[in-house]
Amino acid sequence: MPKVALYNQNGSTAGDIELNASVFGIEPNESVVFDAILMQRASLRQGTHKVKNRSEVRGGGRKPWRQKGTGRARQGSIRSPQWRGGGVVFGPTPRSYSYKLPKKVRRLAIKSVLSSKVIDNNIIVLEDLTLDTAKTKEMAAILKGLSVEKKALIVTADANEAVALSARNIPGVTVVEANGINVLDVVNHEKLLITKAAVEKVEEVLA
């Protein structure tokens, strides 16, 4: 079982913690992680693109000129696709781009990125993370004490408003609950700060 240092929020070590090998100690599967990121990014697309077809463009109800005798090509409407200002053929319409990968694949992806953080020594497990009031200065001091200088994902066991508000104005820092941890967030942040209680919740779901 992988073993990592356990820290308190002052930045000093408080011993070690053993992580579940089936969650934090697997061989990362890069192709599955790639598929999971594609799925998440697809679901973020708005899909509100829209153009008008010939039935939706204003006008064009009258035949522009008679069928025969003018010498010109026959036309039925000034809103046909070949006309300037006419309707678009097979243009984009509003749609949802979201899709779901199988549950086992999604779980393998999140296990892979969590294991990668352990392998790269980019995971910091905290005994607890509590703040009496929401103060950005206090959160910045905690991150500095833990030598976190780049983008960091903070994972708490439950909703913690003080922590979320304190980290909100720090660039590159995101706070999520254990049940909301996802592949895209873990990959987009160099450091993973996770409380001991959150580790237990994640292991309970994924092990």
Swiss-Prot record:
Keyword Ribonucleoprotein belongs to the record: yes
Keyword list, A-Z: Ribonucleoprotein, Ribosomal protein, RNA-binding, rRNA-binding
Any single biological process term in GO: translation
A GO-annotated cellular component: ribosome
InterPro entries tied to this protein: Ribosomal_uL4, Ribosomal_uL4-like, Ribosomal_uL4_dom_sf
Signal peptide positions on this chain: none
One Pfam family this sequence matches: Ribosomal_L4
Chain intervals for the UniProt region annotation (Disordered): 48-85
GO molecular function: rRNA binding; structural constituent of ribosome
Keyword match Zinc-finger: no
Protein family per UniProt: Belongs to the universal ribosomal protein uL4 family.
Subunit structure: Part of the 50S ribosomal subunit.
PANTHER family, alphabetized: 50S RIBOSOMAL PROTEIN L4, LARGE RIBOSOMAL SUBUNIT PROTEIN UL4M
Descriptive protein name: Large ribosomal subunit protein uL4
Gene source species: Bacillus subtilis (strain 168)
